Amino acid sequence: MANITVYTKNLCSFCSAAKQLLKSRNYPFDEVNMEGDTELMMKVIKESGQRTVPQIFVGDVSVGGYQELSAAVASGEFAELVANT
């Protein structure tokens, strides 16, 4: 199973929702809080192409934010990505 990383910030409801969704489906993940870490935020923006949080990665593959994660989980694409990455 590939490593799942969720990049978050404090007081982010979409971050909480993404983490809860992953937990409810028994996906282990690492959370990286980017609050106050401008260098890390710029790196994640460059890798994901997005300026919002959360940003979810499976290995080096950007899934996107909460809405993209939710859609990918519902369609089965997320399970396939995790299994094949």
Where are these regions (language model features)?
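Residues that form or flank phosphate/diphosphate-binding pockets in enzymes
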Residues: S16, E39, G64
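Non-catalytic, surface beta->alpha helical segment in thiol-disulfide oxidoreductase systems
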Residues: V58-T85
